[in-house]
Swiss-Prot record:
Gene that encodes the chain: psaA
Protein name, as recorded: Photosystem I P700 chlorophyll a apoprotein A1
Disulfide bridge partners, by residue number: none
Top-rank taxon, per record: Bacteria
Job of this protein: PsaA and PsaB bind P700, the primary electron donor of photosystem I (PSI), as well as the electron acceptors A0, A1 and FX. PSI is a plastocyanin/cytochrome c6-ferredoxin oxidoreductase, converting photonic excitation into a charge separation, which transfers an electron from the donor P700 chlorophyll pair to the spectroscopically characterized acceptors A0, A1, FX, FA and FB in turn. Oxidized P700 is reduced on the lumenal side of the thylakoid membrane by plastocyanin or cytochrome c6.
Length: 776
């Protein structure tokens, strides 16, 4: 990638004096009438069907349009605004559905019995059968996105407020869309502005995350938490009294602007009426009623204490605003990222690199692909952490007892995380090919990584084989023993035990921390379990289990090692695609061939499907396999050992009567007692409100099977078939002007993996929803 030089004779000016170019590119709507305007070859129009595939492949590959880093940066920056506009429009749609087509008020009045719905099917060809009874006289489609629970946590009490939010989100969409146009056509930032790393860190940490978190804290303290306190009191059967008026329903709750009255809100949280003098006099304990550290969950809602959540956001705001001030920008004080990274030495044992991290700052600040790879890996990992917090630390009221929603949110965040991590590998591969300069990186950690790639990959390969043979071997053994009627020789909790002692020890550590002074500033320590899933007690809401201890046994240890196997294979494939992106013994000149290429020309047989893109392609399959095992395990484990109803004597009746420990230790058990037994709801859904999922289940299977046609067949077969058909058309003088051509190997694989993932996701979606919605 080239960097635009300054104009000849022009003296470099400080970036703060002139950070943008005015009227950089005039808005030209005629370009949109010419598909492929960004490429000379594509702009000529199609002469074969390959043109449409190349158009899709290159439309957003800004690197190849001009090859200028400044122009690419401007396009990406402008596209960010467009992305935000789409997000705001999507949010507006959600708010609008909540305002016009939902039973939000009915759910808010009785969240333990009324089911959430924000969509009603119109009776056109009989599909109104899908409008099931949600309770309180409302019929619609049950939603499992968790937005009702989230809105309740925000302090939203009516559809009127949702309509206001829908309108506001549309206004924001218009504003950011205008911002994208403005910052590309009217005031385009210069490359130096994009490369001001310290200023960017300050803007993100202080402005976006720090002040954003502080602003959200303000909303929680002044609006959401007082509203939730009133709603909690109503749900607990002990409504509060404000100014002599009993707050018996959500309609009685004061409006947000009324809660700014200190005398009124002081009746809910006295600390809010004490004034800011306590803040400046450091008497912060006066605020301890609305900024708490309770730990555990609210027994009324089964969710984290809203006052704990406010405290959390306030703490993050302080950390981020302080941390954002430590970087050196225009005043010449503070840390320089270049100096920090340049002074870091490599690991003397694993990667002895004399030049340490020298050159990494330049690489990251000149390669947006490298930055994106790091960010995607971090955010993807964060999404997976969020998935696990949905059930262990449920953040929103009544989320924990809405089992379909918990499963949906877990699955969603796992898949999003997996896709982002695969995206990280993709952009790391592109960065290595397009932005990595071998002459610059000499004996630094990047160089040492590439030189040690054979050792890294061979060790990963050994780990994968060890985990694969041993974990699957345990299952083979158990299936064989059960088939032969020798249950006493199986690995199980009742025969040969393989207890996860380390995990059980960690669980007991969390449980034993209750009452210890583990919290700074407290004398009593943790008043309750951080999360009741770690050897805690049963938290029941509305007669259903919200949280309880999750027991671990032999089945969990066996599946854990299956997870370890599949995740390590995914890591092996993705990492190999990055480390071997520029060259390999088979294809030494990969760097010249680019990120994606089908085959490496005549005379070099066996060199197809070795590009960095092909590794991402394979990694996507293994990512899907890995996460399918994770979400299936989660679904079955929770139904068997956690979710259920709490009886009057305190005992729990689980959804599937605890069959996980005995059935999940054989492959046959997974097929019979999970896939087959739990698919009964979706397979028998016709004629019920779940019939839509029955159709989706079949449709998802068809899309998935359709992908195999692209993945199992060779390009040559299709090209020969096309040529025969073209010959027949020529005979009849019906030949098209655009020549039909078979997909390239890369294009075929792209179509295949897309349908494979889409079909599998839709099938799983229908399977999970029908199962848990069918159980009620």
């Amino acid at each position: 990638m080239t960097i635009s030089p300054p104009e000849r004779g022009e003296k470099a000016k400080p970036i703060y004096d002139q950070p943008v170019d005015r009227d950089h590119v005039p808005a030209d709507f005629e370009k949109f009438e010419q598909p492929g305007f960004f490429s000379k070859s594509l702009a000529k129009g199609p002469n074969s069907t390959t043109w449409i595939w190349n158009l899709h492949a290159d439309a957003h590959d800004f690197d190849t349009h001009i090859g200028d880093l400044e122009e690419t940066s401007r396009k990406i920056f402008s596209a960010h605004f467009g992305h935000l506009a789409i997000v705001f429009i999507w949010m507006s749609g959600a708010f609008f559905h909540g305002a016009r087509f939902s039973n939000y008020s009915g759910w808010l009045a009785d969240p333990t019995h009324v089911k959430a719905s924000a969509q009603v099917v119109w009776p056109i060809v009989g599909q109104e059968i899908m409008n099931a009874d949600m309770g309180a006289g409302f019929n619609g489609i049950q939603i499992t996105s968790g937005i009702f629970q989230m809105w309740r946590a925000w302090g939203i009490t009516s559809e009127t407020e949702l309509m206001a939010l829908a309108t506001g989100a549309l206004i924001m969409a218009a504003l950011v869309l205008h911002g994208g146009i403005f910052h590309y056509h009217k005031a385009a930032p210069k490359l130096e502005w994009f490369k001001k790393i310290e200023s960017m860190l300050q803007h993100h940490q202080i402005g976006l995350f720090g002040l954003g978190s502080l602003g959200w804290t303000g909303h929680l303290i002044h609006v959401a938490n007082p509203t939730n306190a009133l709603l909690d009191a109503i749900d607990a059967g002990t409504p509060m009294v404000l100014d002599g008026k009993t707050i018996a329903t959500a309609a009685d709750i004061p409006l947000p602007h009324e809660l700014y009255n200190a005398d009124l809100v002081g009746q809910i949280y006295p600390g809010l009426a004490s004034g800011v003098g306590n803040f400046f006099s450091a008497n912060w304990w006066a605020f301890s009623d609305f900024l708490t550290n309770n730990g555990g969950v609210n027994p009324v809602t089964g969710a984290l204490w809203s006052t704990d959540v406010a405290h959390h956001h306030l703490a993050w705001a302080v950390f981020l605003m302080f941390g954002g001030h430590v970087y050196r920008s225009r005043f010449g004080i503070g840390h320089s990222m270049k100096e920090i990274m340049g002074n870091v030495k490599g690991d003397p044992l694993l990667f002895p690199a004399p030049n340490g991290h020298k050159g990494l700052f330049e690489f990251l600040s000149n390669s947006w692909h490298a930055q994106l790879a790091v960010n995607l890996a971090c955010i993807g990992s964060g999404s997976i952490v969020v998935a696990h917090h949905m059930y262990s630390l449920p953040p929103y009221p009544y989320l924990a007892t809405d089992y379909p929603t918990v499963l949906g949110l877990f699955t969603h965040h796992m898949w999003i995380g997996g896709l982002m991590i695969c995206g990280a590998a993709a952009h790391a591969g592109i960065a290595v090919i397009r932005d990595y300069d071998v002459s610059v990186h000499v004996d630094n950690v990047l160089d040492r990584m590439f030189k040690a790639r054979d050792a890294i990959i061979s060790h990963l390969n050994w780990v994968c084989m060890f985990l694969g043979f041993h974990s699957f071997g345990l299952y083979i053994h158990n299936d064989s023993m059960r088939a032969l009627g020798r249950s006493q020789d199986m690995f199980s909790d009742s025969a040969i035990q393989l207890q996860p002692v380390l995990a059980q020890w960690i669980q007991s550590l969390w449980a034993s921390s209750i009452g210890t002074s583990a919290v700074v500033g407290t004398t009593t320590g943790l008043p309750g379990a951080v999360s009741d899933v770690f050897n805690g007690s049963v938290v029941a809401v509305g007669g259903k289990v919200a949280l309880m201890a999750i027991p671990l046994g032999t089945a969990d240890l066996m599946i854990h090692h299956i997870h370890a196997f599949t995740i390590h294979v995914t890591c092996l494939i993705l990492l190999k695609g990055v480390l071997f992106a520029r060259s390999s013994r088979l294809v030494p000149d990969k760097a010249n061939l680019g990120f994606r290429f089908s085959c490496d020309g005549p005379g070099r047989g066996g060199t197809c499907q070795v590009s960095s893109w092909d590794h991402v392609f394979l990694g996507l399959f293994w990512m899907y396999n890995s996460l399918s095992m994770v979400i299936f395990y989660f679904s079955w484990k929770m139904q068997s050992d956690v979710w259920g109803t709490v009886n009057s004597d305190g005992s729990v009746t689980h959804l599937v009567s605890g069959n996980f420990a005995q059935s999940a230790i054989t492959v046959n058990g997974w097929f019979r007692d999970f896939l087959w037994a739990q698919s009964s709801q979706v397979l028998t859904s016709y004629g019920t409100g779940l019939s839509g999922y029955g159709l989706l289940f079949l449709g998802g299977h068809f899309v998935w099977a359709f992908s195999l046609m692209f993945l199992f067949s060779g390009r040559g077969y299709w090209q020969e078939l096309f040529e025969s058909i073209i010959w027949a058309h020529n005979k009849l003088k019906l030949a098209p002007t655009i020549q039909p051509r078979a997909l390239s190997i890369t294009q075929g694989r792209a179509v295949g993996v897309t349908h494979f993932l889409f079909g599998g996701i839709v099938t799983t979606w229908a399977f999970f929803h029908a199962r848990l919605l069918g159980l009620g």
